[in-house]
Amino acid sequence: MVSAVATMDKLRKKDWTVRPIDQQTCKRIITNYHYAKALSQISTERFGLFKTGQDFWEDSALGCSVWLPPTPGVIKRYKKYSLSECLALTRLAIAPEVPKNGASFLIGKSIQQIRLRRPNVRLLVTYADTMQDHT
């Protein structure tokens, strides 16, 4: 299916929104669009990327970010934070038809939501898999 979204060169913020989604929706997106094809059974926060003006059915999500507490090694590195004050981005997946900057937009809006929903979180950690040409 080719959508009008696929013809856009760069994401326009007014055309997209980010909101919390369920684990099942994340699993569908990760299975379809993430190279690892796997998702943890649990997650602390999950957000989906949606085209503005669409009905927000979970099936219409075109991307997701998944956040969990980081590994113990990360907590040791940042000693001034407790586990409850930290989250790590463990999965990020975007459908191919999402315009450029879709991933950055999703991460930014996810961070805003985390700040609102979890004011105790003071450290967010993200990783880039350089073997997959992520930066």
Which residues does each predicted region cover?
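An active-site-proximal beta-strand-loop segment
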Residues: A36-T44, T52-G53, P72-Y78
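Residue-identity detector for glutamine
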Residues: Q23-Q24, Q41, Q54, Q112-Q113, ...
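Acyl-donor binding region in acyl/amide transferases
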Residues: T17-P20, D59, W67-T135
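Short amphipathic alpha-helix that is part of the acyltransferase structural core
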Residues: V2-I42
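Conserved beta-hairpin
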Residues: I30, S43-P69
